[in-house]
């Protein structure tokens, strides 16, 4: 493991890469949502390790072999929430991030690659097609709640597609076949207590910010402020943990919830409509601890442009894998 060269391909802000940082030679990430003008969020954790938008940029920084590719290419096109918005499922085979991943595997021929995605991916891009496109690789598929890795989000289900060179099957197959917990899952109450030990301030949107949520009982269903929403959560809607809309099409607003103190937290998403048990909007520190990130994983915030950086940070923390999957990969690689 001492000489491993690891490349991120569409690995966002590096949840899979951070536990293996000393082996990482770069991250090719074409998606603009992960980039900022000076790449402040990336640099605060990875320093000068290349964080680029294309292969052409990457080869200006690094020329050499790649042993392992880690990826969390686009999965939103195959999600339930995406389907509810667009009424159609995406075509991951045509997605630029999946295409880039396959191109980099064919180019570098790594010993191992790991793709984190949504379970639906293999319905749209079957394993038989992966085997046909990458005939030199043998595959292992894991499809589990991330709680199986030790994260607390029981409802967050993820696909882990592992490919390794057939000639190295004896080395990788036994190691990556088993799932185990690298942390102990916790209820929301304990997670919130843990989050207070983090050094980052729990930045969140101002109480007077309006978000696309409404009180279904009102004739004029205008957007509510976070202050109004908190009051409703703790009074009229105190028995609800999903936001009621009570319409003919749906009873609750998709993806909008507040966590229960004595249950596991629900799935965090890049949206700003997820709430703590007391009805307050979730802050950056809450996202960190629920996604499993340690205190040493730093967050860049510029208080002079707080709204922008809260949004960027929420995407960095939630659009991609939980931290425990990266720890699981590291523990497995250490056995080889």
What residue ranges belong to the model's regions?
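Short loop/turn segments at secondary-structure transitions that flank enzyme active sites
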Residues: 15, 72-75, 165-169, 274, ...
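Core alpha/beta nucleotide-donor-binding catalytic domains of modification enzymes
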Residues: 2-109, 119-123
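C-terminal target-recognition/interaction regions appended to catalytic cores
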Residues: 215-336
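Residues at alpha-helix caps and immediate loop-helix transition turns in enzyme cores, especially N-
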Residues: 38, 125-127, 321
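Extracellular structured ligand-interaction cores
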Residues: 3, 156-158, 263-265
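Class I S-adenosyl-L-methionine
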Residues: 60-66, 75-260
């Amino acid at each position: 493991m001492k000489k491993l060269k690891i490349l991120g391909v569409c690995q966002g802000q590096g949840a899979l890469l951070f536990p293996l940082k000393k082996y990482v030679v770069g991250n090719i990430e074409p998606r603009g949502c992960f980039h900022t003008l000076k790449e402040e969020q990336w640099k605060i954790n990875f320093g000068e390790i290349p964080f680029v938008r294309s292969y052409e940029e990457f080869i200006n920084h690094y020329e050499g072999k790649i042993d392992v590719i880690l990826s969390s290419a686009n999965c939103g096109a195959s999600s339930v929430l995406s389907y509810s918005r667009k009424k159609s499922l995406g075509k991951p085979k045509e997605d630029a991030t999946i295409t880039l991943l396959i191109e980099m595997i064919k180019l570098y021929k790594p010993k191992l690659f790991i793709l984190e995605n949504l379970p639906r991916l293999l319905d749209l891009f079957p394993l038989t097609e992966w085997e046909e496109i990458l005939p030199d690789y043998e595959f292992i598929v894991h499809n589990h709640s991330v709680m199986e890795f030790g994260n607390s989000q029981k409802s967050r289900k993820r696909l882990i597609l592992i490919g390794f060179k057939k000639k190295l099957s004896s080395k990788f197959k036994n190691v990556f076949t088993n799932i185990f917990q690298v942390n102990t899952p916790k209820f929301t109450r304990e997670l919130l207590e843990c989050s207070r030990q983090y050094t980052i301030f729990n930045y969140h949107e101002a109480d007077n910010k309006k978000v696309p949520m409404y009180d279904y009982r009102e004739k004029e269903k205008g957007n509510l402020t976070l202050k109004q929403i908190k009051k409703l959560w703790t009074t009229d809607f105190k028995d609800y943990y999903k936001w009621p809309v009570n319409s003919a099409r749906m009873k609750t607003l998709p993806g909008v919830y507040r966590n229960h103190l004595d249950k596991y937290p629900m799935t965090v998403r890049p949206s700003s409509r997820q709430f703590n048990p007391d009805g307050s909007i979730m802050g950056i520190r809450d996202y960190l601890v629920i996604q499993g990130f340690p205190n040493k994983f730093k967050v860049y915030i510029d208080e002079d442009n707080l709204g922008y950086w809260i949004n960027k940070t929420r995407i960095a923390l939630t659009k991609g894998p939980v931290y425990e999957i990266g720890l699981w990969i590291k523990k497995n690689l250490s056995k080889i």
